[in-house]
Amino acid sequence: MSRDLIRALNDAWRPLETDADLDAVLERVGDRRVVLLGEASHGTSEFYTWRARITKRLIEEHGFHFVAVEGDWPDCWEVNRYARALPGAGPGAHDVLHAFHRWPTWMWANREVVEFAEWLRSRNDEREPESRVGFYGLDVYSLWDSMDAVLRYLEDVDAEAAERARNAYGCFDPYQEDVQEYALASRYVPQTCEEEVVGILRDLRHKAGRYLSETLRGGDADPLLARELLFDAQQNALVAKNAEAYYRTMVRGGAASWNLRDLHMVETLDRLLAHHGPESRGIVWEHNTHIGDARATDMAAGGMVNVGQLVREKYGDDDVLLVGFSSYEGTVIAGRWWGAPMEVMHVPRARRDSWEDVLHATGRGDGIVVTDALARVADASARRGHRAIGVVYQPAHEMHGNYVPTVLPDRYDVLIHIDRSSALAPLHYRADDDGEPPETFPTGM
């Protein structure tokens, strides 16, 4: 392990104990339009908690307009509805988030997000409706939920268009809401549902002005709400189009489906920025594998792009801040296979000579590293493994598959290191828990 690198890390290190210590991050924000906050797992309390703390300060001190997360648009729209006190909102953040039903539920249905959503609601209650901060989902997985949302909107504004959309979306009926069945069928049957979802999106965009003017014609409708509901419907139609392409592409393997997903997330981010106006600023919450620049990893060699890379390329390095997270050891919520029950798992000490190992070797505990301070150190430009834990995790095998070769100063502008981390607190328990959490279930924030 390089002494020069350890010395450089110690020089760049800023301790992390209180909200005031986040000044080291906030000082880097300046006038940047997009701040992307990562996570090294989808089940670590400290990643969620510190990310929320940074976000609160970005909203209060820098006037950011929305939070966009690695979640489904329809589910996150209900959080947005509650946080902004829009008509039809649920009674509380716990109820809204507990209704998240797609595995892995714990990603957003957890106490850490409940606390943030309640804070956002309280903060928004003090603002005029047009100044309230929103909460949105960037992901592409909600094919059927998004089609249902489009139909509900059209039924309210255009019965004939709703019937046409119902017939078009009926193309998916044989697959009984099973995306795997549709994906496999598209591999062997030349006739897919692509034209149908593209057509509905095109029609909805073409008639958007008419729908808005007709909704407002009577004079009783709330203009802000009318615009929000139209935007929601258009986004759901876009999700349906891109989800169809994603599942059709997924069965072919390779980088194409990954790229399509991240391109969709960037397209959604672009739409949110445009929707909130030319001076708008957005905060993104996603896994490190999405927000860290792919060009600084081995992803690029595999033909993969990601959100961090694409946003830097689109808006420029000076208008984007990428903040990654890491942990040396601890516990995490994950499943042992896709769809498996959630578990509290032990995260072993990081692999020797990984970035986590080097950060631990400083002996500084939890801290913040502004990575441009490392650019002058030759060892910092070498690729080292950087741990990435997804919703599926098998600790016994992590040495062979959970480390992404990374040039740290190129991948992130800032890294937040939690030396010993703990599992987050999901709202759902497994069916076989008999309603009682296991002894190892996290009880604190």
Language model regions located:
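Structured catalytic-domain cores with a bias toward divalent-metal coordination
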Residues: 1-445
